[in-house]
């Protein structure tokens, strides 16, 4: 959107786009018409009757007359178009836009020439009034009030012309649409009226003629649109001139206005605007230095002789050289390459022979690496002025002329300074640029010294070349080593990724296999001992258990796996002591086995398994403090020894005689030893795996509060196993001697000193509430406190 001086926007510049839209709409309508005609032809072929032949001649005559009239109309339209084009060439360019639009609209075959002429005349009159207003505004600069009024009038006239243009275009569009609709309706009526009388050949002829007419009309419209698009620049000129005519520019208090002959936007300014837009839309061409080589900067355009003396040229010669370069290469994007080729002898820091040798491709040396800096002594003014002639070479082809002018100015300034000082390069010594050896004068040097200098320079060049080669080789070695290390690191990363992938895959397979694994379940239901200790499952899989170990399965007398699973789950969930669920000949401590194998995070707890020789030496590792550790009986209790069970004939008599709950083996040291026993023990010696005793052990029992030490009425008579059958009291049970005190009363001192073979490791046993709460189901001893006695 363009804006005028008042800040208002207008859409006048968008008319070419609007014409393109109209052209697309027309093409779409033509395609629709062709489709409709094809459909009608198909319908007519279906409805064609055999008696339609007599009417063919009349229809042919009518058709020839219509074609003759149409040809005459086309000829008239072509003549009118030619006349109007001739008038356009003679008239102003601003008026050609309206006439071209009229041509484009008349090419459709409409008879609107009079209306178009009237509209163009009104537009011309408005344009003339606008120009007259601007002229009057330019002429009346004496008074500010009159100039402002004329400017306002010119602005209003320009806006009126714009409005008339828009209204004219909109009216023409409406007329075109109406006429197209009328033509379509007429064609449809003709087809419907003559559908029964048209022959197939005549239909084809009419169709071909209509297609030709449509092609002619579309060609005319496209030509008109092309003309309108070509004159878009003229529309822009007209709008710019009309909008910026009334602009008044003040220069130091003086008012001046642009004249009609020199408008504010001249063709040159418009051309520059177009060029800038084109450069912005196109991609800039970045031309780097060829093969990555940046040429050295040039000095002033002068010739350096073999005696290291600079003879500066005049400004005219420098200008001629630069202009010759610019004229020879007007499209070159980098003129410094041509300047290099033209002034190859003016390179700083070398003579003619040395420069030719350094620019040779076969050698590896150049002039910048020499240690002898006598040839590098040049004029500082020429370096400062001539060193910036070429720029950086990245500006492209835009500022070629400015670069050449800068080079000419710098050369002229250098020559002017040299002439003003009235000193020549031959007589005076040039100023030095920094450190280095003091340059020797050419007049004081003999040929021998010159030869020595030349040899020294060659030697220095060779040394510099060797140094560069060594540095390049070292750099290449380091880069190769770095590449090898990078490759090695990448390989290690890939290996780590592969190992992680395999690890994740194995973990996934293990997790998927764990629910369906039968070996884990069998291990959970079995106890394996190694050297008298319970071995975990990991040792079983590793095969570390040798012949000294013994494996026992926890089976009840029912020999069913269902009871096994139910008993194990109940014991594990309740954290009960394992002494209650044992049967004769089996290893108890199933709770500890589950804890050691099922819990992978808990520490390894190895419990001793008692053999037949160690039945009465029950080792029970208990902590010395009140706190619990891994060996406490709350979660991991060692298995008690296997005991021999005797059948009880009467359960009621047994419960009445025994006040404290004991295990089936009455010979355990965990129970108090009384002097007398009930008479029912004389019947022991039956089945060791009695179901009655197992049922008795599973019954819930009350915890006693005191130790029953009363002497019973009947003497304790036990038939000793393995004796000849005498009725004497037993002196030993399974090889362990039994020594009973003479009295029937027991206290703490008598228990400690009574010759039982046990010594205390702590103070007196005092039951506490916390210990009773912690061990609600542990009933191996008369007290609720765990046993604090160890075997000697």
Curated annotation (Swiss-Prot):
What are the boundaries of the region Basic motif? 452-454
Q: Which GO terms describe its biological process?
A: embryo development ending in birth or egg hatching
Q: Where in this chain does the entry annotate a coiled-coil region? A: none
Which stretches are tagged as biased composition: Polar residues?
A: 96-110, 349-368, 420-429, 593-603
* Stretches the record annotates as Disordered: 96-119, 349-391, 413-455, 545-606, 623-642, 770-792
- Segments of skewed composition (Low complexity): 370-387, 553-583, 624-637
Annotated spans, Leucine-zipper: 455-462
Positions of the bZIP domain:
450-513
Please verify whether the record's keywords include Transmembrane helix: no
Q: Which GO terms describe its cellular component?
A: nucleus
Keyword set for this entry? Activator, DNA-binding, Nucleus, Phosphoprotein, Transcription, Transcription regulation
Q: Does the keyword Membrane apply?
A: no
Annotated GO molecular function terms are:
DNA binding; DNA-binding transcription factor activity, RNA polymerase II-specific; RNA polymerase II cis-regulatory region sequence-specific DNA binding
| SUPFAM superfamilies associated with the record | Leucine zipper domain (SSF57959)
Assembly state and interactors? Answer: Homodimer. Heterodimer with Jra. The kay-Jra heterodimer binds more stably to the AP-1 site than either of the two proteins alone.
Q: What does this protein do?
A: Developmentally regulated transcription factor AP-1 binds and recognizes the enhancer DNA sequence: 5'-TGA[CG]TCA-3'. May play a role in the function or determination of a particular subset of cells in the developing embryo. It is able to carry out its function either independently of or in conjunction with Jra.
Q: Which family does it belong to?
A: Belongs to the bZIP family. Fos subfamily.
What name does UniProt use for this protein? Transcription factor kayak
Taxonomy of the source species: Eukaryota, Metazoa, Ecdysozoa, Arthropoda, Hexapoda
């Amino acid at each position: 959107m363009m804006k005028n001086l008042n800040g208002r926007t207008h859409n006048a510049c968008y008319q070419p786009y609007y014409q393109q839209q109209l052209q697309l709409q027309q093409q779409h309508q033509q395609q629709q018409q062709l489709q409709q005609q094809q459909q009608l032809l198909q319908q007519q072929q279906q409805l064609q009757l055999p008696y339609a032949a007599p009417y063919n001649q009349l229809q042919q005559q009518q058709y020839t007359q219509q074609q003759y009239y149409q040809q005459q109309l086309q000829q008239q339209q072509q003549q009118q178009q030619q006349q109007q084009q001739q008038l356009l060439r003679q008239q102003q360019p601003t008026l050609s836009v309206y006439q071209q639009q009229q041509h484009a609209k008349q090419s459709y075959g409409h008879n609107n020439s009079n209306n178009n002429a009237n509209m163009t005349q009104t537009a011309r009159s408005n344009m003339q009034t606008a120009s007259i207003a601007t002229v009057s505004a330019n002429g009346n600069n004496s008074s500010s009030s009159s100039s402002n009024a004329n400017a306002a009038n010119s602005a209003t006239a320009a806006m009126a012309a714009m409005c008339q243009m828009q209204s004219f275009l909109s009216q023409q569009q409406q007329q075109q649409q109406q006429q197209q609709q009328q033509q379509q309706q007429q064609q449809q009526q003709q087809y419907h009226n003559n559908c029964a009388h048209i022959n197939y050949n005549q239909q084809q002829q009419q169709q071909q003629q209509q297609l030709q007419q449509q092609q002619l009309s579309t060609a005319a419209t496209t030509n008109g649109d092309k003309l309108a698009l070509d004159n878009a620049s003229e529309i822009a000129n007209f709008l710019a001139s009309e909008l910026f005519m009334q602009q008044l520019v003040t220069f130091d208090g003086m008012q001046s206005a642009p004249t009609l002959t020199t408008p504010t936007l001249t063709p040159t300014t418009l051309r520059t605007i177009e060029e800038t837009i084109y450069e912005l839309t196109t991609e800039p061409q970045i031309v780097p230095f060829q093969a990555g080589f940046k040429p050295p900067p040039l000095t002033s355009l002068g010739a350096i002789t073999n005696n290291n003396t600079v003879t500066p040229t005049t400004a005219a010669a420098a200008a001629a050289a630069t202009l010759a370069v610019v004229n020879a290469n007007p499209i070159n994007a980098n003129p410094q390459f041509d300047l290099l080729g033209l002034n190859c002898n003016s390179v700083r820091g070398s003579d003619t022979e040395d420069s030719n040798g350094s620019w040779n491709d076969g050698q590896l040396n150049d002039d910048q690496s020499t240690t002898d800096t006598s040839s590098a002594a040049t004029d500082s003014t020429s370096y400062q002025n001539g060193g910036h002639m070429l720029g950086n070479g990245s500006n492209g082809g835009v500022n070629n002329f400015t670069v050449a002018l800068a080079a000419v100015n710098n050369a002229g300034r250098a020559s002017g300074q040299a002439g003003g000082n009235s000193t020549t390069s031959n007589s005076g010594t040039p100023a030095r640029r920094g450190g280095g050896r003091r340059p020797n004068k050419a007049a004081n040097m003999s040929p021998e010294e010159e030869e020595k200098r030349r040899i020294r320079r060659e030697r220095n060049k060779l040394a510099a070349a060797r140094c560069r080669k060594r540095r390049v080789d070292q750099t290449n070695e380091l880069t190769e080593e770095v590449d090898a290390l990078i490759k090695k690191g990448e390989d290690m990363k890939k290996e780590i990724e592969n190992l992680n992938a395999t690890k994740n895959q194995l973990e996934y397979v293990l997790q998927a296999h764990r629910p369906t694994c039968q070996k884990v379940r069998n291990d959970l239901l079995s106890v394996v001992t190694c050297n008298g200790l319970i071995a975990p499952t990991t040792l079983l899989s590793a095969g570390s258990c040798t012949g000294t170990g013994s494996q026992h399965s926890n089976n009840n007398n029912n020999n069913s796996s269902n009871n096994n699973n139910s008993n194990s789950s109940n014991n594990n969930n309740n954290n009960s002591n394992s002494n209650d669920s044992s049967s004769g000949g089996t290893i108890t401590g199933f709770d500890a086995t589950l804890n050691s194998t099922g819990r992978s995070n808990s520490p390894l707890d190895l419990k001793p398994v008692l053999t037949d020789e160690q039945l009465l030496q029950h080792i029970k590792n208990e902590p010395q403090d009140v706190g619990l550790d891994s060996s406490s009986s709350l979660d991991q209790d060692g298995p008690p020894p296997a005991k021999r069970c005797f059948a009880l004939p009467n359960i009621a008599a047994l419960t009445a005689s025994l006040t404290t709950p004991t295990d089936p083996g009455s010979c355990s040291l965990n129970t108090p030893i009384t002097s007398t026993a009930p008479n029912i023990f004389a019947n022991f010696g039956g089945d060791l795996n009695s179901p009655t005793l197992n049922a008795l052990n599973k019954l819930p029992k009350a915890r006693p509060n005191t130790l029953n030490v009363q002497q019973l009425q009947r003497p304790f008579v036990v038939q000793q196993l393995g004796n000849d059958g005498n009725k004497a009291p037993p002196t030993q049970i399974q090889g362990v001697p039994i020594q009973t005190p003479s009295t029937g009363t027991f206290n703490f001192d008598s228990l400690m000193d009574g010759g039982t073979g046990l010594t205390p490791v702590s103070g007196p046993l005092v039951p506490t509430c916390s210990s009773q709460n912690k061990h609600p189901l542990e009933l191996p001893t008369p007290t609720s406190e765990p046993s604090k006695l160890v075997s000697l």
